[in-house]
Amino acid sequence: MTRHFLRDDDLSPAEQAEVLDLAVQLKRERWSERPLAGPQTVAVIFDKSSTRTRVSFAVGIADLGGVPLIISTANSQLGGKETASDTARVLERQVAAIVWRTYGQAGLEEMAAGTTVPVVNALSDDFHPCQLLADLLTIREHRGDPAGQTLTFLGDGACNMAQSYLLAGATAGMHVRIAAPAGYVPSEAVVADAERIAASTGGSVRVLTDPVEAVSGADVVVTDTWVSMGREEEKAQRLAELGAYQVTTELMEHAVDDAIFLHCLPADREYEVASEVIDGPRSVVWDEAENRLHAQKALLVWLLRQS
């Protein structure tokens, strides 16, 4: 049966751990898996501009013996004349997998339903699951097994990163805290899904408004941009409403002494995070950025094996 990765909870706890174990192997032995040798082609589709996603998938597919076919929807029929399902049926005749960085989650679900090759969510408005695999790998490297650790996300709790932390963190058995003001909270449905998962993994989920309370005793502190692509007209309002959630050195002092700081990048310095934090000794954002490569390679290898 074809497996897709559209949401973080598309992987069970055991499957998530398996992918992360494989990522550790591929980081240590970069060319040890070559499932795309031939070479086979992977379509990598972009509705949004990208640096880390484009580079990490292109390099990773090449490492696995394949050829990345980079497609911009601005120069294709997808999203215009042709449906996602029809595009998928065309692509599956020629590629081994489809990776799509897009807006709506519904388009990804439509594409996955219409194809027999794996579809990977490289980012949507709702979730950023590939980034979370990289983040969990980074936590493993710097703090050990994520299970039982406390992770606090500060800022826009309704953004795709916050929602992915809820699902992926719960799957990993973490205690996930989202600190956000009213109007910036995660989807109730996503919180409910995360709570259900956490009940079986020993994790927990909390949504709070007080940033100090949320960071107190945290092992991992995370934030993301407050002004995502397409929301530039809301910048002034967002900066005013989210200002109390900036990650500063003072706020980090409420976390455990060896807490780490994560940010998926790009960062708006002096907005969601102070430069002295992102450049400081607790920051592991550059390892996190590199780990996109290893985590996504592992995901592709795993999906191709299952499918």
Curated annotation (Swiss-Prot):
MF term (GO), any: amino acid binding
Catalytic activity: carbamoyl phosphate + L-ornithine = L-citrulline + phosphate + H(+)
Keywords tagged on the record: Amino-acid biosynthesis, Arginine biosynthesis, Cytoplasm, Transferase
EC number annotated for this UniProt entry: 2.1.3.3
Pathway(s) this gene product operates in, as recorded in its UniProt entry: Amino-acid biosynthesis; L-arginine biosynthesis; L-arginine from L-ornithine and carbamoyl phosphate: step 1/3
Biological process annotations from GO: arginine biosynthetic process via ornithine; citrulline biosynthetic process; L-arginine biosynthetic process
Binding site for L-ornithine: N160, D224, S228, M229
PROSITE patterns in alphabetical order: CARBAMOYLTRANSFERASE
Function: Reversibly catalyzes the transfer of the carbamoyl group from carbamoyl phosphate (CP) to the N(epsilon) atom of ornithine (ORN) to produce L-citrulline.
Protein name, UniProt field: Ornithine carbamoyltransferase
Species the sequence originates in: Clavibacter michiganensis subsp. michiganensis (strain NCPPB 382)
Record gene name: argF
